[in-house]
Amino acid sequence: MNQLEALKQFTVVVADSGDIDSIRQFSPQDATTNPSLILKAATLPQYQPLFDDAIAYANLQGGSPETRLINASDRLAVNIGAEVLKSIPGRISTEVDARLSFDRGMCVAKARKLIGMYQEKDIPRSRILIKLAATWEGIRAAEELEKEGINCNLTLLFSFAQARACAEAGVFLISPFVGRIYDWYQEKQPTSDYQAESDPGVISVRDIYDYYKRHRYQTVIMGASFRKVEQILALAGCDRLTISPALLEQLKNSSDPVERQLTPSTEAFHPPSPLSEAEFRWEHHQDAMAVDKLAEGIRLFAADQQKLEALLAAKL
């Protein structure tokens, strides 16, 4: 048994890719996309028909150049998501434009629109996760969407305050970013050679996992943004892990043993009172890494969204 097969005994494996060929190769349960992955996929020749369809769809809908661009971008994300769903049994995560991260109402409206576009393709909402940045506004939007039966994946999660607020809002799933946390500490302390057990990103997910299980929160924890296989193996037993094709390949090519590292607590505690907005902002801002990385993540996703729109605008 290879490490990928062994890991699947403890953890739901998710492909962090929009590349259908890669996804088919590793048989994941689910897949996640983001603006960076959609941008990458949009330039692949096999996706040209999906790109062309997005342009045709936007032109058919009409409206101002800005409206057509937004519709083309949304349609392309849904086209790629729908294509990926043909190769997996579970769900696809499709991301709301990062530029809406501080506007609760716009996040809700965009999520409903994306779900509607999937439904036009006869894909039920039960196969979609709407990805939202784990800002206070994004978490509140997710709380509202969950009540409508639209499940959400709260991404760019770096602080314990974000994780706690997501659980208290009853969101379906969170994506704590292991690798980006690791990157920040490596940059600040370049001489540190973090082993898996002392890796700040790994420790962050373990702490969230223990807290959720002790308080019996139903929110799924999906570790994300891995830099190396050791980080993945250190989180064997986490509810889900979303892994890039390159690291899935490494796991598939190794037969070293995989041991479960995370197990749910048998103890149960009453959850504390939910964080207020002021408490959330204070707690989150006590973590310099989380403040830096959330802001950077939103900027990077927004920049890739703009690059994608430039590709689309050239064809509209």
UniProtKB/Swiss-Prot annotation:
Its EC number is 2.2.1.2. InterPro entries: Aldolase_TIM (IPR013785), TAL/FSA (IPR001585), Transaldolase_1 (IPR004730), Transaldolase_AS (IPR018225). It catalyses: D-sedoheptulose 7-phosphate + D-glyceraldehyde 3-phosphate = D-erythrose 4-phosphate + beta-D-fructose 6-phosphate. One of its GO terms (biological process) is pentose-phosphate shunt. It is found in: Cytoplasm. PROSITE patterns: TRANSALDOLASE_1, TRANSALDOLASE_2. It is an enzyme of class 2 (transferase). The active site is at residue 131. Pathway: Carbohydrate degradation; pentose phosphate pathway; D-glyceraldehyde 3-phosphate and beta-D-fructose 6-phosphate from D-ribose 5-phosphate and D-xylulose 5-phosphate (non-oxidative stage): step 2/3. This is Transaldolase 1. One of its GO terms (cellular component) is cytosol. Belongs to the transaldolase family. Type 1 subfamily. GO terms for molecular function: transaldolase activity. Transaldolase is important for the balance of metabolites in the pentose-phosphate pathway. Homodimer. Keywords: Cytoplasm, Pentose shunt, Schiff base, Transferase.
